[in-house]
Amino acid sequence: MVNTSDFKEIIENAWCDIANISTNTSITGVIDEIMDLLDQGKVRVSEKINGQWIVNEWIKKAILLSFRIYDMKFVYTNCHDSIIGNFSWFDKIPLKFGQWNADNFKQAKIRVVPGAIVRKSAYIAPGAVLMPSFVNVGAYVGEGTMVDTWASVGSCAQVGKNCHISGGAGIGGVLEPLTASPVIIEDNCFIGARSEIVEGVIVEEGAVVSMGVYIGASTKIIDRTSGEVFFGRVPAYSVVVPGSYSSGNVSIYCAIIVKKVDQNTRNKVSINELLRDNYAATSI
């Protein structure tokens, strides 16, 4: 990571004078540099320090300030392709790959399928694969991670290395409030198709989240074996499926930890095998 103390001070001062930010042209160059650093993975909205995820609020402020000072622009692209054709958009944030050529992709060591949209300031690490998907501002996608078809990685969300974000899954984003943590998917996690992880939830290393699991900050995550209840985090190496628990005369949705596996088992056993026998008992 680069030394950002000067940038931080400039952004904090600009934030205190946000009412006049549109007339403060001197801040534009600083924000451009911060967006470039995010884009290159040299700074991050959130990072793990001494085992704890820390939010760099000043970077979120820089992104929010960019929406204040950048002008809306019309962009028209002629792909010269009979299948893709021409397309256009109108936005303040350019696309990450808008000015890239073949050499840029080779140097980045990533694979990007037609239909993948990534906004400037999102970092895509070497070995990552983007199917037709969407990655928003300030997000981080780690080495060897697959973002599958129609999946989305929200603003400032952090996805670790060797993860699989399955088709149609949503990894929630957050810019405001400034103190709110983004969704964090740690290394070696699997997020099943059409699942949604939102509101700053942390999915810890090696966890497997089945298809169609919805987890927010207030969602109960119940360990079927121990009865322990978690909020806001999926413990490391947990296997999680959708379920329900009884509350009076009704059943209320929850996520259920049906088993935990160690790292060796997680590495050796396929995801399907981990999930296959666990749908019979998803009500508590």
From Swiss-Prot:
Top-level taxon of origin: Bacteria
Catalyzed reaction equations: (S)-2,3,4,5-tetrahydrodipicolinate + succinyl-CoA + H2O = (S)-2-succinylamino-6-oxoheptanedioate + CoA
Listed GO biological process terms: diaminopimelate biosynthetic process; lysine biosynthetic process via diaminopimelate
GO cellular component assignments: cytoplasm
Its annotated compartments are:
Cytoplasm
Q: In which pathway does it act?
A: Amino-acid biosynthesis; L-lysine biosynthesis via DAP pathway; LL-2,6-diaminopimelate from (S)-tetrahydrodipicolinate (succinylase route): step 1/3
> Which is one GO molecular function term here?
2,3,4,5-tetrahydropyridine-2,6-dicarboxylate N-succinyltransferase activity
Which enzyme class, named as a word?
transferase
UniProt: substrate binding residues: R111, D148
Ordered alphabetically, the record's keywords are: Acyltransferase, Amino-acid biosynthesis, Cytoplasm, Diaminopimelate biosynthesis, Lysine biosynthesis, Repeat, Transferase
Q: What is its EC number?
A: 2.3.1.117
- One Pfam family named in its UniProt record: Hexapep_2
Query: Which family does the record claim for this protein?
Result: Belongs to the transferase hexapeptide repeat family.
On assembly, the entry states: Homotrimer.
Q: This chain belongs to which protein, by name?
A: 2,3,4,5-tetrahydropyridine-2,6-dicarboxylate N-succinyltransferase
